């Protein structure tokens, strides 16, 4: 079963698989954290498949000169995204919100020395994450029910908690979900097929 799931992941990246594997090996050798993955049997919750380092590398190139203070990863898994950007940005705060025990406890232990990183175990579909007034949100397909994910994105888009601008980064979200964001400024979109890729949006609340 595990082998079939891994094979399914590889097949989903098609012709970009060689590039994906290259960046996975590169950052693994650099000692980056968050390389664990697990498969979910809970309806609505996606497998914990870390965002490819290739995507993170490209996203970083695009946002490295954009100012933000608080980065929230909704569905943070084993912490790969937070670990990656914590090494790229100075003087930033990070919050990871994760539902599953295993991933949450892993992150709590492995990131405990970082005062600027906090992990919270909650169901992001019910949790009031807007209370933190974040100006950067990252979602790597945390939910496989479009209606629920669209509801979360609308909360972020319509948030009155943050009077400034918000950076919104979505990974591996399908086109039906992205339609609800067509009125936002799209900084960059990169997809290798219909389901695998990322989009970066800018919400200007000023």
What residues fall within each predicted segment?
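S-adenosyl-L-methionine
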Residues: 1-66
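Conserved SAM-binding strand-loop segment of SAM-dependent methyltransferases
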Residues: 114-123
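Conserved class I S-adenosyl-L-methionine
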Residues: 68-77
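A short SAM/SAH-binding and catalytic strip from SAM-dependent methyltransferases
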Residues: 135-147
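Conserved SAM-binding loop
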Residues: 107-108
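Conserved SAM/SAH-binding beta-strand->alpha-helix loop
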Residues: 100
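C-terminal substrate-binding/active-site "lid" region of AdoMet-derived donor-dependent transferases
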Residues: 146-202
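Glycine-rich SAM-binding Motif I of class I
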Residues: 79-83
């Amino acid at each position: 079963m595990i082998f079939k799931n891994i094979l399914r992941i590889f097949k989903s990246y098609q012709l970009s698989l060689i590039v994906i594997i290259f960046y996975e090996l590169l950052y693994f050798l650099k000692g980056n954290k968050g390389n664990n993955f697990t498969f979910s049997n809970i309806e609505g919750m996606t497998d914990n498949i870390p965002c490819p380092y290739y995507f993170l590398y490209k996203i970083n190139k695009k946002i490295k000169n954009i100012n933000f203070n608080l980065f929230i990863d909704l569905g943070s898994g084993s912490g790969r995204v937070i670990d990656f950007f914590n090494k790229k940005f100075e003087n930033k705060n990070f919050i990871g919100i994760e539902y599953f025990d295993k991933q949450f406890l892993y992150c709590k232990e492995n990131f405990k020395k970082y005062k600027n990183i906090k992990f919270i175990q909650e169901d992001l579909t019910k949790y009031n994450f807007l209370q933190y007034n974040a100006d950067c949100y990252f979602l790597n397909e945390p939910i496989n029910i479009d209606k629920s994910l669209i509801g979360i994105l609308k909360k972020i888009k319509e948030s009155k908690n943050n009077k400034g601008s918000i950076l919104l980064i979505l990974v591996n979200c399908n086109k039906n979900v992205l339609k609800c964001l067509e009125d936002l400024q799209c900084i960059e979109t990169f997809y290798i097929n219909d389901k695998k890729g990322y989009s970066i949006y800018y919400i200007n609340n000023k």
